[in-house]
Amino acid sequence: MADNSHTRVVVGMSGGVDSSVTALLLKRQGYDVVGVFMKNWDDTDENGVCTATEDYKDVAKVASKIGIPYYSVNFEKEYWDRVFKYFIAEYKKGRTPNPDVICNKEIKFKAFIEYANQLGADYVATGHYADVKRDENGRMHLMRAKDQHKDQTYFLSQLDYKQLDKVMFPLAGYTKPEIRKIAEEAGLATADKKDSVGICFIGEDGHFREFLSQYIPAQPGNMETLDGKVVGQHMGLMYYTIGQRRGLGLGGNKESNEPWFVIGKDMKKNVLYVGQGYENSHLYATHLEASDIHWVDDVVSRYGRDFHCTAKFRYRQTDVGVTVHLSDDDQMVTVEFDDPARAITPGQAVVFYDGEECLGSAIIDRAYSHDRQLQYV
């Protein structure tokens, strides 16, 4: 076994089971492991307990158990400036952002790496389910994890090969049940801790509307069909996303008992467009346009500006076949679908894959059905 004792790995520890086992596995492999808890948001739960404080206590328990030093670093300002302001700005435009993608790019793999360097890190590691592979030229590639259900390359798709050069993903070859078993057998305090869900600054109780209304004044308005018939009232366009069914408060009517879905928004008129039926044609797009393009490595030299690959438009979606057309100035990408795709949502990431490799992503701006732009924002 290689002597890893002179290689320092700084592990981002959240107080969850995945990052706990990440630190444990690296310690067992003989690395000089240091744990760091990132405090990105000042939050209290419904009992007035700061959830970050509770998570940090779990980090302390795990670090003490496996015998590694640990620190806490406060990234609240960086998170506010680089992630949260973006999140609010996108909602103001009527879009549905994915803050996890931006948080990984700006905080967990930028601010955190800079901090880890101050601790003398040779590498950083996180509990993400993903993998990295170095090619013959020494360039890093982002690869899917073994556990396809947990694979998180979707959220890591705006990283580049330089950021990945110093990154380890020790959970790449494990499934979630295996990770829980390792934690249990090692007696880690986080072994049975449930996975965190939702956005970190909203928490798991899901009071999304209440939270968002603190930052953006809600403007109620009409819910209409595309032919202008008013069928209800919306609470504020920012609360709805394309393809949404729940929370509309609309039942069937004499023409149809099919459920209603959000099929569009008009920000200028403050109208939420709704239509009946899961297969409603207004939910299906033939292509999209996206910007804010980030490739893990230079795709143009590998594939050219026009190429076929697969893509996801949301986390845990099955890959679909697409043809990518990259503009000459690299500012815009047009993505044509092999088959019409449902509920393409502006503000979300479209993430590109070649087999097991994640090539990168872009942020969706517009969706089209043939030549007609869908009324999505």
Curated annotation (Swiss-Prot):
What sort of enzyme, by top EC class, is this? transferase
Where does it mainly reside?
cytoplasm
Q: Which GO molecular function entries does the Swiss-Prot or TrEMBL record give?
A: ATP binding; tRNA binding; tRNA-uridine 2-sulfurtransferase activity
Per the Swiss-Prot or TrEMBL record, the active site comprises: 103 (nucleophile), 200 (cysteine persulfide intermediate)
Any one GO CC term of the record: cytoplasm
Q: Name one Pfam family in it.
A: tRNA_Me_trans_M
In which residues is ATP bound? 12-19, 38, 127
* Its EC number(s): 2.8.1.13
Give its localization.
Answer: Cytoplasm
Q: Where is this region: Interaction with target base in tRNA?
A: 98-100
Query: At what residues does the UniProt record annotate the site feature described as Interaction with tRNA?
Result: 128, 348
Q: Which family does it belong to?
A: Belongs to the MnmA/TRMU family.
What is this protein for, i.e. what is its function? Catalyzes the 2-thiolation of uridine at the wobble position (U34) of tRNA, leading to the formation of s(2)U34.
Name of the molecule in the record:
tRNA-specific 2-thiouridylase MnmA
